Amino acid sequence: MTSAIKALVSEYDEKWSALDVAGVAELWERGTPQPVYIGDEYAAPLVGVDELDRHWARVASRLKRASVSSRLVSADELAGGLVRCILLSRWSFTGTESDTAHTGTSWITWLLIARGNTYRIFHHMEAQVYLDEGYP
């Protein structure tokens, strides 16, 4: 389980850092359970494939550079073959409107569903955090 999840985290980081937003979207479940994204930038959760597709289109049109590096903090198997993961993600995004990079760190909680030998994200909750210098 852990090696497949670490591979998913690496793929997530690589695709974001390459601005392969379509590739990031492919890491998500598109069937059942319905995908859910909860992030600070939205007043309400995004639920379902259509809302996520609009989100990916917005993101792809607004970014010109990205760098993402995430660390898997924990992964727990839940009932029904589901997995809960906690990641610490350090990121830098530069929008199309300027050359100023926006950097930060976020805690991310994923719920994953097994699909063959891989996992797909069906729930992503992210909150930016301000950590002390030297925090691992």
Model regions: which residues?
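Short beta-strand edge/turn micro-motifs at domain boundaries
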Residues: 103-136
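Beta-strand elements of well-folded, non-transmembrane domains
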Residues: 91-97, 112, 129
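Short, well-ordered beta-strand segments in beta-rich or mixed alpha/beta enzyme
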Residues: 29, 37-39, 82-95
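Hydrophobic/aromatic beta-strand elements that line small-molecule binding cavities or substrate pockets
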Residues: 70-76, 89-91, 106-113
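Short, cysteine-centered beta-strand-loop-beta hairpins and adjacent loop/turn segments enriched
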Residues: 62-63, 92-103
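A solvent-exposed, acidic/Ser-Thr-rich amphipathic alpha-helical stretch
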Residues: 21-78
